[in-house]
Regions:
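Long, compositionally biased, intrinsically disordered regions
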Residues: 2-3, 15-165
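Sec/Tat signal peptide C-region and signal peptidase I cleavage site
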Residues: 5-8
Length: 165
């Protein structure tokens, strides 16, 4: 018995095969997009956690009589510097003048924590506001291997906490 396949059968088989390849490619593409999206959310979460944990350390120092300690927190590797200070003050170093000019556009009331460069992506966190603090001008902290360290100090008669690089 001889089986003969007509032209329509050959065409529908190849169309199904091509459709399956297109669907597989679409699923893989969506998968890569979702992975990159969630990695972007991870970076955003790290920025939020850095600010929150730093504020907790500042609050602990503010509530204590006297303190001198450091805080080291994780930030995304895309961030090169964490800058602190009021934009109404002058940058403490000529090295930070360019950064100061770039973050000056985020001059909102009370904003005194800045991430440079802007993390971009899905993350809209580019600055934050720390409470109960004072600064010696505008300074930046270098991010080393995804970690940024600041010094926190408060004297017995101080009403605010001094945060320095």
């Amino acid at each position: 018995m001889s089986f003969k396949m007509n032209r329509q059968g050959e065409l529908s088989l190849s169309f199904s095969f091509i459709l399956a390849i297109v669907i597989i490619a679409a699923v893989i593409g969506v998968g890569f997009y979702m992975i990159s999206y969630f990695l972007g959310l991870r970076n955003c979460a790290e920025l939020g956690l850095y600010k929150r944990d730093l504020q907790i350390k500042i609050d602990d120092a503010w509530n204590s009589e006297e303190t001198r300690e450091s805080y080291t927190g994780a930030v995304p590797r895309s961030v090169e510097k964490v800058c602190i200070g009021n934009l109404s003050s002058v940058a403490n170093s000529a090295d930070y003048a360019e950064i100061y000019d770039k973050v000056a556009r985020f001059d909102e009331s009370g904003v005194n924590l800045f991430y440079y460069p802007n993390p971009g992506g899905n993350c809209k966190i580019v600055s934050g506001s720390l409470q109960h603090v004072r600064f010696n001008g505008f300074d930046c902290i270098d991010v080393v291997r995804g970690k940024a360290t600041v010094r926190i100090s408060k004297g017995a008669f101080d009403s605010t906490v001094l945060v320095t690089p």
